[in-house]
Amino acid sequence: ETLVDMTTQLSNCHADAVIFSDFRHGIFNKATIPSFLAAAPRNAFTVGDSQVASRWGNILEFAGCDMLTPNEEEVRFALGDQDSVIRPLGSTLYDQARCKILMLKLGDRGMMTFRAPLEDADRRSFFSVDSLARENILDPVGAGDALLAYATLTQVATGNEAVASIIGTVAAGLECE
């Protein structure tokens, strides 16, 4: 009954973006995610964030979202891959998740963003953004949430993955202070 109520509310709302994130407390799982994705407002930008640092979950359950924002640990768990270096690891998840944008969070090493390549030879299918957190990190809790929120808003406003990645990284860095 709760799932029906929640998906009905979601389908009746008007939103430019919908972020699916519940810190893996049970709302989003393999059985419910398809219902939530189907209920998202037409043309809304959908974002999946599994938040499984302390619980088991699989970011691939959000396959089909427009953007995913996992950390390295979540990607390695989803793919069962503890050995690959970051670029091939992210490329594999990007392909399997069928998302438009994958922002792979790397903690103090920054972030690598994967996107569809264009025919323009100057546009890569991936790029990295260094961490903008200062050396005096006081509280990293919430940095991923700040990145998620600001990157989503910027992507919806600009349609530019590079700008969204940079603004999200700035927000994450500020959250650490």
Where are these predicted regions, by residue range?
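Conserved short loop/turn motifs at secondary-structure junctions
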Residues: 22-26
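Conserved phosphate-binding/catalytic region of the ribokinase-like
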Residues: 5-9, 13-17, 21, 31-64, ...
